[in-house]
């Protein structure tokens, strides 16, 4: 038998979510069967799994040590990647993600920002391997592999939940910088619907709603135009897959370097001259609203991430910085 006392770190999550982390190799069907048979209890009583855990709750697993060991897998994704940390407190962390790094794993063998973050937190003694059995830090805003910039993550359950809720409610201002083809002279807000083809991982911008499509709103303002390009600041109102890339391409201003939605001839020119392999899109700024309790330290604050060197060099040479 093993006993888990719920601490402030684990409090606030569903009981079955905690069990999935603690016995991370066990099928969900096994966990629910153990709950039904009272082999796993909450505060000495039978539980369904959908209970919200509170600090001080007592979880008991009436399972053999061999069974627990069989269904538990320790964190093994240690990395030594140095993170560009923009802000950190006890509950949240903001990281400037480089181009080429996954935000989250796409396959089991992948290394992503999440693994680098967990390694950093363990090495800095902000987290222990035992902590990882009941709580895993996670990111709240995912960027494409080849999009750089600010990624926000929760270090504690309270931080993760509060931050995730703010992104869900769209109360955090998300501002991107991108280099687009063509001259844009005036600020604009464009709207439409986005339809994602899961098979090709590509999206289509529609001007009429279609079953399965999502409403999108993108605001942008030109910072400077010169030599056939515009440095644009984009305010992402909604945040859907490839929204900025596809939406700007649909109005005739594809991102420089975007091989999925961009102009192939323009991309070839930049690849030959600058060895550019990906879109020039950077999550440059986060604006927090008035925050209380867990996020009070970032209330009404703004955080910025510097442009990657290649983006800065190209923008400077094109005369838009």
Q: What residue spans do the PLM features occupy?
A:
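RNA pseudouridine synthases
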Residues: 1-321
